[in-house]
Amino acid sequence: MRDVALSNRVRVFRAEHRLSQADLASAIGVSRKTISTIEVGRFVPSTIIALLLARFFRVPVEEIFSLEDEG
């Protein structure tokens, strides 16, 4: 298996919607820290959280998350 990393555009979508991390977290039922750690790439969200974010922003999950080759 290749080395890959999950990249995301959560911060971009959140900024476009003028939401704080706390606002977004509350809207999808997670903690602000969860949103923060997803945005900086320290936490890989569960499928459920990824789908909740996509549903909230009304975009396909692939517009928020993508795989990038490492190395």
Language-model segments: which ranges?
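A short, Lys/Arg-rich alpha-helix, primarily the initiator
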Residues: 1-16
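Alpha-helical residues within the helix-turn-helix
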Residues: 15, 26, 55
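Short amphipathic recognition helices of helix-turn-helix/homeodomain-type DNA-binding modules
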Residues: 63-71
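DNA major-groove recognition helix of helix-turn-helix/homeodomain DNA-binding modules
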Residues: 48-63
